Each structure stands twice: as C-alpha cells, then as structure tokens.
C-alpha cells in the first residue's frame, strides 16, 4: 500500500516557506574493499560504480506549492556530519564549506548535471548585528560541459555552466544542530548494521583464499 511506502528521510527542517531535508543514500563498499565500509566509487559486482552519501534536498514554496515549488538536490559525504558536529561543539563562530560536482552522462547538448553546495555560519551579519539564524545552506543545480583533468578526474569546463535552480535556507543553531546530530547518529547506526557483516564476509573470503593457496 502507498501509505506503507518506506521513506529515506533522516532529518528535516521546515518553515512555512522553506524546507531542508537530509536523506539516506548510504551504500556499502564491495567486499573486496570491506575496510572502506562506505562505497567510494569502487566497481561493484554488477559492473557499475556506487558512492555512499547523504542526500540534501532544499525546497522553496514561497511562491506556492506543486508546480510553483523550487526543488534542488545535492549530496554530502558521510564524513561531513561528524566533522561539522565536532566543530559545533567547540564554540563555533564561523564555518564555511563549499563544494561543486559534475557527473552523469552528457545530454544531447553535451551538458552534464552540476550541483553546487554551500554551508556557512556567520554569527554577525554585514550590519554588525547578531544573527538569529546564523546558518545558511545554499544548493544550486545546473548543467555544464564535463572536462577531464590531467590527473584523471573531471571538472566543469570554464564558461559552460548554466544555472537552472537555486534555493537557500537560513537555520538557527539549535535546529541545525538537531538535523546534523540526527544524521550523524543515523550514519553511526548504519555502520554498526552493515559493517560487521561486511567484515565477516571479507574475512571468510580471505581465509578461503589462503586455504586454497596452501593446497
């Protein structure tokens, strides 16, 4: 039944105009790379490459819901959440994190998907006054030409980026801590759930390989 559909939402912050949501997109590493625990782009048994991440969804429905809602998405690595949590526990005054990614197959115009993500904290605004909502999350989605780097990676080819949608959400300290803390705890629970089996499977394969080599 539709009412029983499993949701991958981990944590959510919502106002009457904006929404910020963290979602479960975690994936285990293949057994050959068991110690990675999280998939980091290693080739899977089916031949594709997977990445373990936390999804970020921002929505702006200040102009209305349905077709009028602006929705953007991005991904964060699992390691981001314990990192920012540790910074927040040390009387954090300023925080500045930006990341942009280009991925996916090019469309008929040679453009691939681009996500730009910014998470910043500033306790004082440009006017010198203390901010009640010091955290600002900005996600921008667009398209660009994917270009290979000399080291084998990819980046956005200069001058080709075309912005499609952008949403920002301002959050106070308590609400931001809550959604980050809940996500960090979920990641820990996920690792304690999938990690032991991954380690056991890898150890068994390793023991079998050693036994076969001694015959």
Task: For every predicted segment, state its role.
Residues 53, 73, 134:
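Beta-strand-rich binding-surface signature
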Residues 45-50, 74-78, 129-130, 166-177:
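Short, low-complexity cationic-aromatic patches
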Residues 79-112:
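Acidic, metal/cofactor-coordinating or nucleic-acid-engaging core segments within structured domains
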Residues 58-77, 154-169:
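A cross-kingdom feature marking solvent-exposed beta-strand/loop segments within repeated
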Residues 144-215:
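Mixed-charge, glycine-accented linear interaction segment located at domain edges/termini
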Residues 1-68:
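N-terminal "first-domain core" detector
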